[in-house]
Curated annotation (Swiss-Prot):
Location of N6-acetyllysine modifications: 129, 138, 160, 162
Disordered: annotated span: 1-66
Domain NR LBD: start-end pairs: 192-420
One cellular-component annotation, GO: cytoplasm
Required for DNA-dependent dimerization (site feature) positions: 124
Domain of life the protein comes from: Eukaryota
Protein name as catalogued: Steroid hormone receptor ERR1
One Gene Ontology MF term: zinc ion binding
Family to which the UniProt record says this protein belongs: Belongs to the nuclear hormone receptor family. NR3 subfamily.
Location of region: AF-2 domain: 402-422
Annotated zinc fingers (NR C4-type), start-end: 79-99, 115-134
Function: Binds to an ERR-alpha response element (ERRE) containing a single consensus half-site, 5'-TNAAGGTCA-3'. Can bind to the medium-chain acyl coenzyme A dehydrogenase (MCAD) response element NRRE-1 and may act as an important regulator of MCAD promoter. Binds to the C1 region of the lactoferrin gene promoter. Requires dimerization and the coactivator, PGC-1A, for full activity. The ERRalpha/PGC1alpha complex is a regulator of energy metabolism. Induces the expression of PERM1 in the skeletal muscle.
Amino acid sequence: MSSQVVGIEPLYIKAEPASPDSPKGSSETETEPPVTLASGPAPARCLPGHKEEEDGEGAGSGEQGSGKLVLSSLPKRLCLVCGDVASGYHYGVASCEACKAFFKRTIQGSIEYSCPASNECEITKRRRKACQACRFTKCLRVGMLKEGVRLDRVRGGRQKYKRRPEVDPLPFPGPFPAGPLAVAGGPRKTAPVNALVSHLLVVEPEKLYAMPDPASPDGHLPAVATLCDLFDREIVVTISWAKSIPGFSSLSLSDQMSVLQSVWMEVLVLGVAQRSLPLQDELAFAEDLVLDEEGARAAGLGDLGAALLQLVRRLQALRLEREEYVLLKALALANSDSVHIEDAEAVEQLREALHEALLEYEAGRAGPGGGAERRRAGRLLLTLPLLRQTAGKVLAHFYGVKLEGKVPMHKLFLEMLEAMMD
């Protein structure tokens, strides 16, 4: 089991009720209600280099036309683990009742499996019981979240999400010893990465998938519904991620909520921008949902595509590295301006520790002398106002969608939207 960060107070996320048409009767099923998907996702294509899942359950890329959403070859709502018909989203991905129950039993029982072969067994509907080790490995590979499983075995009620990474707690505040780590992006020198940066790299959430449905009707409403569902799942992951940041869990529970409610969209928007860095004039909302500016407009996002691309181009010009991204993301969290924060000094202490970690990383990257690290850190920090401005536009747009009442939204997403617009 993962070790606990000192001071963690659990946040509770209530699961959505089960879909009335969910498949029943599997010998492996349990009765825990699934977190259901909002209806009508939009067609889209995958990120370059994204491999299709075996058994045809991954999203294939189609031919891209100018400003159009491109249909994926994904069959309607299949389980990403075994390819059976999915009953909804369970623990972060589309999955069937059997794989949902298997994953739940494995986590609750802390069961360890071993593969009798070479850890490369094919997992299909017919063969999913043949190798439990490879089945569980595939559950994790497609993105099932361990923190989505209640560990008390009590059915129903409120669902407790613990932090994902199984890492030792990092003391806060304190010194951040440096160690060498190769910097991504070419033949640059190695940069010393302090313990905080290393920790942030470890706790960075795994990929989420939008799972757009190519059988959904034309129009922008299905696409907006897909994004609302994606954002709802990302909020759950963001809460878990924030809890793993040293210093955040030492805040009072009310201050944790105030911080999250004020900056969650900035964290999500920065994630979209980071996924889009390898692309040219396209936005990667998820691994399997990539739109250009015209495609975003066709999907009902109005001018948001242009606003998001402006942020992406700013970060592309800076050649943002992954270490810098995880620091910038944590700084965006700590950069809350909520008037409801009770202990502003504690939040400021967290912000200063992250700022120092950024300066230390840039100092190792730039080498001694010249103050280049401070200039680089300053340029990165100057992207935060644009990030906040862009997130504000996204919030305003989806709050307008909420007021129209034409697109179903999950309870958590609604609550976070309303908290921001109050």
